[in-house]
Amino acid sequence: MAQTLYDKLWDAHVVHQESDGTCLLYIDRHLLHEVTSPQAFEGLALAGRQPWRVGANLAVADHNVPTLNRAQGIEDPISRLQVDTLDDNCAKYGITEFRMNDLRQGIVHVIGPEQGATLPGMTVVCGDSHTSTHGALGALAFGIGTSEVEHVLATQTLLMKKAKSMQINVEGELPFGCTAKDVVLHIIGIIGTAGGTGHAIEFSGSTIRGLSVEGRMTVCNMAIEAGARSGMVAVDDKTIDYFRGRPFAPVGVLWDQAVGYWRTLHSDAGARFDRVINVDARDIKPQVTWGTSPEMVLPVDGRVPDPDREKDDVRRSGMERALEYMGLKPNTPLVDIRVDRVFIGSCTNSRIEDLRAAAVVARGKRVAANVRQAMVVPGSGLVKQQAEREGLDKIFIEAGFEWREPGCSMCLAMNADRLEPGERCASTSNRNFEGRQGQGGRTHLVSPAMAAAAAVAGHFVDVRSFR
C-alpha cells in the first residue's frame, strides 16, 4: 500500500498501539533548553529516575542568553537561574550541552541540524513549539510540554495518537525577490492559523524542491503557525549533501547504510492525504504581516484591510482589535508604514543564507535616521563565525546594524532584547502576537531581505525594486 512520508516515519517508531489508536512512540532525539526543562528534571529527580538514554539528549541555552556583553553574564536573576539550572542538570546526568560561551551554542532549532543531531528518519522532540523546523530534514519533529519532556527523559517514548495528513503542494518557479519566508507566510494567509489543526503537513512540489535545506527549515518552522503540530519535506540529494561531515552524522559504512534508508523517505506515488492544498508560486510576492496573527498578512504592494468590508462578525472584530493594537488605519499602503526597530534573527531566519540575503540589501547603505535600532543576531556561534569569515559582519556594522551574539533574542520578550510599548518592528521571527516582542510592541513579520530594506528605508519597501 502506498504510504505518505508521515505514514513511514510514524509506523517506523510505533512501539505499541492500543485499540483506540493511542500509540507508544519511540523518540530518537530529544533537544533541551533552559525554559521548559527545569521542572522536568525536578520531576525525574523526585521520582528517583535516570534518563533512559542519555546520548539521545542534546541541550543548549538560547531563550534567556544575552546577545550583548555576554562576558558580563546574565543580569536578570530568573533568566540566570534557568540557564544555571540547565547547566547543573546536564552535568548531573551526563547530558551533552553547548554552554553559553561554547562556539557551538545557539538557538536549539539551528544547532540541531547544524550538528547533524537531527537526521532524516528520526523522531525529534523538544519543549518548544517550533520543533517542527527539523521536519525539513525528512524527520518527524514536534514540540512537547514540560510533563512530556520528563516522560521522554524517563522512557524515551511518548503516548499520542496519529494526526491526519495534509499535503501542501507548491508548484512553479519562485518569483524574483521572494524567499522561503514569503512562501510560508503566503500559505498561512491562504489556509489561516487553524488550517492545519490536527494535521501533519508535508510541503511538496517543485517550489519546495527548489528551496535550499535552510529555506525548507524556514517553511517547516512556521508549520505550527498554520495550526499543524509538525511539518516535513521529503529527503532528496540536497538533504543528504547537507549532512555530509556533520559532527553527529554517521560515517563510513554506517553513512552508506543511512543514505540507503534516507532515500526511501518520501511519499509514494498514489499515497493518499486527508487534505491537499495546491499553491501556485507565481502568485507569491514579498509578504508583510499587518496585524496580530501570522494569517493577517498581505503582499508588500497591498494596503491595510478595512474591517468594514469583512462580512464575518468574528473576523471583523478581530481585525478591528488588531488595527487598534497595531496603531494602523484601514487602506494605508503597507509601504507607508514606518518602523522603529529591525530584528534579523530567530529560529526562522538566522542561518547563514538568511544573513547573506540581508547583507546583499544592506551593502553600501545606512540604517535610516528614524530607525532607533537594527540588530542582526546569528542563529549559532558557528553561523556567526561563518558570517564573519565572509565579511558579513562588516557589511552590517558599516551600515549601522548591531552585530550580536547568538540566541533567541528579540523573537520573544524573555531576555534583554525587547520592544518598548508602541515601538514598531520589522522582524524575521515567526510570531506577531500582542506583546510577543515586548509589552505593547508591534511586530511585522517579513523575510531577511525585506527587514534589511525596511531598516535602510525607514519604512516597508518592496525589495523587488529596492535600490
Swiss-Prot record:
GO terms for biological process: L-leucine biosynthetic process. Binds 1 [4Fe-4S] cluster per subunit. CDD domains: IPMI (cd01583). Its EC number is 4.2.1.33. Keywords: 4Fe-4S, Amino-acid biosynthesis, Branched-chain amino acid biosynthesis, Iron, Iron-sulfur, Leucine biosynthesis, Lyase, Metal-binding. Its cofactor is [4Fe-4S] cluster. One of its GO terms (molecular function) is 3-isopropylmalate dehydratase activity. [4Fe-4S] cluster binds at C347, C408, C411. NCBIfam families: leuC, PRK05478.1, PRK12466.1. Catalyzes the isomerization between 2-isopropylmalate and 3-isopropylmalate, via the formation of 2-isopropylmaleate. Belongs to the aconitase/IPM isomerase family. LeuC type 1 subfamily. This is 3-isopropylmalate dehydratase large subunit. It comes from Bordetella parapertussis (strain 12822 / ATCC BAA-587 / NCTC 13253). The lineage of its organism: Bacteria, Pseudomonadati, Pseudomonadota, Betaproteobacteria, Burkholderiales.
